[in-house]
C-alpha cells in the first residue's frame, strides 16, 4: 500500500496555529507526528512518501502522480476559546470512514485526550 502523508503548513510560509504561551507551531508538531507515522507505516510494510508544503494543488498532484492509495493530511486546530479541547479525525469519502475511526480510536487511546469524534466533509482536498 502506498501512503502519502502531508504534515500541514510549511515553516517558512505559514506555520499554522501558534501557541501564544509557549510559541509551539503547528507546522513543527505535525512534521514530527508525520515522521513518526511514516516510520510506523514503513515498518508495517507500506510505501510512504511525506511532503510538507502549503501549496495543496502541488501536494495533491504529487500524491496522485505517485499513485498513492491513501492520502493523510495532519493538522492541529486552534481557537481563541479556552474550552475547546480534544481530538477529531476528518475524512472525505465513505471509503475513508473506516480508517478515520481507527485513527481516532488509536489517538484517543494513546494520548487520553477528549474524543471530539470522527467527522465527514466533502470540502476536504
Predicted features along the sequence, with ranges:
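Short glycine-rich His-centered loop
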Residues: 1-23
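Active-site-proximal helix/loop segments of hydrolytic enzymes
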Residues: 24-125
